[in-house]
């Protein structure tokens, strides 16, 4: 069995799990997430824990058991605590402003960039150069952060652009005469 799948997923207080065929639903304080479980993976609930095992012993089934365990663990963490990703804007005149479901970005283009946030994702701007992207779906939070960063990735000479808060930008030396 996969080493990841051997570890059970602990269900914190206030988190409910429901099975309907191959559909797994996780409900918590922050919302509900659903996942289609692969047919080769068996999920069992016992004593406030979810256990994952492969129905047959082949390599793909063991791999899917580990993948499913990781996805369900992220779902449980998302509906109980949520996920957030912090972005920083570095550059003269680079600004961000969150207005409802739209993130307005001034990134040095001749036009402002308006990014429509998908359902289930919120954005906050504690300052004009910081963006906090929050949600319960880890994949979606990371996807939105990557798309916003993609508008103006950090460049290696001056470091200008949109970067993750924990990102280290490798700098290059300017050309010498």
From Swiss-Prot:
One of its GO terms (biological process) is cytoplasmic translation. Part of the 50S ribosomal subunit. This is Large ribosomal subunit protein uL6. It comes from the Bacteria. The gene is rplF. Keywords: Ribonucleoprotein, Ribosomal protein, RNA-binding, rRNA-binding. GO terms for molecular function: rRNA binding; structural constituent of ribosome. GO terms for cellular component: cytosolic large ribosomal subunit. NCBIfam families: L6_bact. Belongs to the universal ribosomal protein uL6 family. This protein binds to the 23S rRNA, and is important in its secondary structure. It is located near the subunit interface in the base of the L7/L12 stalk, and near the tRNA binding site of the peptidyltransferase center.
């Amino acid at each position: 069995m996969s080493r990841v799948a051997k570890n059970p997923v602990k269900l914190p207080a206030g988190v409910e799990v429901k099975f309907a065929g191959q559909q797994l639903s996780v409900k918590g304080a922050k919302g509900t997430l659903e996942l289609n479980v692969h047919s080769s993976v068996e999920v069992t609930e016992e004593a406030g824990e979810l256990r994952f095992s492969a129905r047959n012993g082949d390599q793909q089934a063991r791999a899917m058991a580990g993948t499913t365990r990781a996805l369900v663990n992220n779902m449980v963490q998302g509906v109980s605590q949520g996920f957030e990703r912090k972005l920083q804007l570095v550059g003269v005149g680079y600004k961000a402003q969150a207005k409802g479901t739209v993130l307005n970005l001034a990134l040095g283009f001749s036009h402002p960039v308006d990014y429509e946030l998908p359902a289930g994702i919120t954005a906050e701007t504690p300052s004009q150069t910081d963006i906090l992207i929050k949600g319960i779906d880890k994949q979606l939070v990371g996807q939105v952060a990557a798309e916003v960063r993609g508008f103006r990735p950090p460049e290696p000479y001056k470091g200008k652009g949109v970067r993750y808060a924990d990102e280290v930008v490798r700098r290059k030396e300017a050309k010498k005469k």
